[in-house]
Amino acid sequence: MNISIIWKLSADENSNLITLQCLKEQIIAADLNVQVLIYQKENDEKNRFISELETLKIKADKYALINENSLYEHAQKHVTGDIITYLNGGDRWTPGTLRQVQEISEKYSKNNIFMLRKVMPDGTGGAFAMDEMNKKIVVQDVTKEFYCYPFYFGGTFLSNKVFVENKFDETLGMETEKDFFLRLMAKEKKFIFLNSQIYESVEVQEGNSTFYEGIYKREWYEESFTEFWIPFLKNLKEKYGKVPSFIQYHFMFTVKSRIMSNLNNRNKHVISQGQEKLCLERMGQAFQYIDCLLYTSD
């Protein structure tokens, strides 16, 4: 099996070295053909990363990052692996992850999505579901289990087919990955959860009301609803007759995240005084696509 890894470099050199070491250890431990696509913001040379990876007989290529979301469409044209995944500089996996993904993807060959247990820098999983039975491998059916899963690319492995054939809409800014993965899951309905393999993200994700960078951005409170959630939910209702329940749960989680991020007086929010009502009205417009039983039940 071949694996393609999309690696977006960090501005912090030490973070990149953490990920480089992780990749070297993973690749040495697994008998795999690996392709690494390296993306960077600045036009400086990172030949050290390429040369070190190539000593392991890995195909590594470096590309300039035009904007945060342009790499997805570019990578879709250049990946060669059977399985595709993504890393930010500073991210790392549990030892043996690539070998485990190889084995599981071959065993569950009809599935296209494989997700690791994702944790943030403090070791917590945020609001996202964990398997209470502590099974190593769980087949998750999102039509039956309405949890709020961490639908972002880091820590997720996709088959080449679903990665290449589905569109990343980079005009959605910070919601680009969410749009891609929620639409994909609405079609696929099932994914494989590798509960024993951990992906540690260097970036804090939505749900953390102190360190998630979105709480300081106006677009998280405005464009997120006007440009993404409202038209997204409307489109799903027209397509499926109702918005899939797992997506409704995810929407409720995002609303709660914004409210919880603005319950204090530390002036970290970006909603101007007097604009709170307008922000709530935008959220309210999206609720026309949410089942009332979902937000009135305990």
Please provide the spans of the model-predicted regions.
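Short, well-formed alpha-helical segments that are part of the catalytic scaffolds
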Residues: 12-27
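Acidic donor-binding segment of Leloir-type glycosyltransferases
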Residues: 24-65
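Short aromatic/hydrophobic "clamp" motif used to bind/position activated sugar donors
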Residues: 84
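Conserved donor NDP-sugar-binding/catalytic core segment of glycosyltransferases
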Residues: 96-128
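Catalytic beta-strand/loop signature of glycosyltransferases that borders the donor
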Residues: 117, 191-205
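A recurrent flexible, glycine/aromatic-enriched loop bordering the glycosyltransferase active site
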Residues: 137-158, 216
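Acidic donor-binding loop at a coil-to-helix junction in glycosyltransferase catalytic cores
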Residues: 173-180
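Conserved small/polar residues in nucleotide/adenosyl-binding loops
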Residues: 295-298
